[in-house]
Amino acid sequence: MIVKEIRDEDFTSYKKPSMVIGFPRCSWKCGKGLCQNSPLTTAPNIDISINSLIERYMNNPITNAVICAGLEPFDSWEDLQCFIMNFRYWSGDEIVLYTGYNKEEIKDKIEWLKFYEPIIIKYGRFIPNQQPHYDEVLGINLISDNQYAEVIS
């Protein structure tokens, strides 16, 4: 699997200590110049097996969730599916998906994800000059008013 980033421990993107996996593709629906993840476009690709990612997670006693984030995890749908299916074999911990898509744009994918609970999705494109707001589900501030998270399963 190709990823752009692996953070074994993150304490800022979710209310629980999390491993963050940065997926390598994006359709630039927000506009490349607006993307808060644009530095990842020039980051080198990391070629790592799904099993190695899961092993890193399982061997870390600090993390309690996995975050699949940007660039855009839904633009690497097959890899995301494979990761989730394999992760669920080993762990029932929460999987948080950070997406710039709106809920309506990924309805079919949400239906598939419901079988792999617990899954949380943070929806919404980045919009500049918005007031940050606290999201109860994630337990953090989100940067744009249109962004929100929900537990889908």
Regions flagged by a language model, labelled:
Residues 2-15, 58-62, 91-153:
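Auxiliary Fe-S-binding modules of radical SAM enzymes
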Residues 11-48:
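Canonical Radical SAM [4Fe-4S] cluster-binding loop centered on the CxxxCxxC motif
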Residues 22-25, 40-42, 85-88, 115-117, ...:
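Short, low-complexity, polar/charged sequence segments that are solvent-exposed and flexible
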Residues 62-87, 127, 131-139:
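Conserved glycine-rich "GG(E/T)P / GGGxP" loop and the immediately following alpha-helix
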